[in-house]
Amino acid sequence: MSSTRRMQILRAVVEDYIRQQEPIGSGALAAKHHLGVSPATIRNDMAALEDEGYLTQPHTSAGRIPTEKGYRYFVNSLSTPIPLTAEQRESISSALSGSASLQDTLQRAARILSTITGQYAMVSAPSLSRSLMRHVELLPLAAHTLLLVTITETGRVVQRLVSTDTLPNTEQTQCICETINTHCRLLTFRQCAQSIRTLPTDSEGGFTPQLRDAIAAVFSDMENEERPNELFTSGAASLTHQHIDAASLAPLFDALEEQVVLMRLMYDLTGQPGQEGVGVAIGSETHTPGLLHASVVSSGYGQSSTPSANVEHEEYDTGTKPTMPIAVIGSIGPTHMNYAVTMAAVHAVSRYLTEFLRVGHNGWQE
């Protein structure tokens, strides 16, 4: 589509339809928007947009509504991301402050995202396999058993038993921990296992080949035993107030139960280029039958490429951006959702979560 005027008309139709969920006529566009042409010219342009697949006419005498192609063009080329209001930013900050645990934080994040968008919100727990190791401790439990306590960058605390032929003393255990922390900090569990296997052993210092290999094996096991991410949700009831066709609601709610499918979709969307870390799937783009009349907006959160960000004042295209998201956050609503607001809200909450996890919180033990 090359006509600037047609682009303006498409944008006006999408924005007006998002607001009122009623077919948009040429007369209404001429009266409301300063397009500089007559209703007849607008009507001709709308007919051309319909021929090109961007608009459709639900009834012969009615105006036009956007198609999936129209929404996609709007999201890619027309929708101007907007910063959240000071009140919305403060509500996010307040919601994520003072939580008792990581689970509590993620549930709060889902609730505040649902509140801002008026839609269904999903927040996944950090993936263990994607997390980075912050610190390890070794604690003696029995004659041939050590407790390996691993803390990730997200504050997740993982405890595993390590069997050893010879139990190192307290001083030796401390030295072993210091060595592992020096070589493995900010590595994934897989990288930790690989790094530990290359460390020189010191049998006199308690770091025997058997103990080294046992610790490396524990990290490998933690990498391989990854369970499906826990998903925190909020706002399912709000979808019943979103002008979604009644026949589409049951399949939509069925789709929301398929958490593994939703997780895979959200992770796929985080890799979309050109969306400032926010991915959007519209209708059939979700490849999920129950979401044919819905859209999914998703972003990753977690380990960031920069050490800090002033998230209190960040806008849509600034702030801490995850280099390798360890979890995802998303919003599901009708295809006529307010994309600009939803994308900004998903982006903002994901950045707040990234910063919140970086600064630290109470550990999530398992």
UniProtKB/Swiss-Prot annotation:
GO MF annotation terms: DNA binding; DNA-binding transcription factor activity
Recorded family membership: Belongs to the HrcA family.
Database matches in PANTHER family: HEAT-INDUCIBLE TRANSCRIPTION REPRESSOR HRCA
Record's keyword annotation contains Transcription: yes
Disulfide bonds: none
Annotated Gene3D superfamilies: 3.30.450.40, Heat-inducible transcription repressor hrca homolog, domain 3, Winged helix-like DNA-binding domain superfamily/Winged helix DNA-binding domain
InterPro entries (alphabetical): DeoR_HTH (IPR001034), GAF-like_dom_sf (IPR029016), HrcA (IPR002571), HrcA_C (IPR021153), WH-like_DNA-bd_sf (IPR036388), WH_DNA-bd_sf (IPR036390), WHTH_transcript_rep_HrcA_IDD (IPR023120)
Protein's recorded name: Heat-inducible transcription repressor HrcA
Job of this protein: Negative regulator of class I heat shock genes (grpE-dnaK-dnaJ and groELS operons). Prevents heat-shock induction of these operons.
Species per Swiss-Prot/TrEMBL record: Bifidobacterium animalis subsp. lactis (strain AD011)
Gene Ontology biological-process annotations: negative regulation of DNA-templated transcription
HAMAP family: HrcA (MF_00081)
Region (Disordered) location: 298-318
Keywords, sorted A to Z: Repressor, Stress response, Transcription, Transcription regulation
Comp. bias (Polar residues): 298-309
Claim: Transcription regulation is one of the keywords in the record: yes
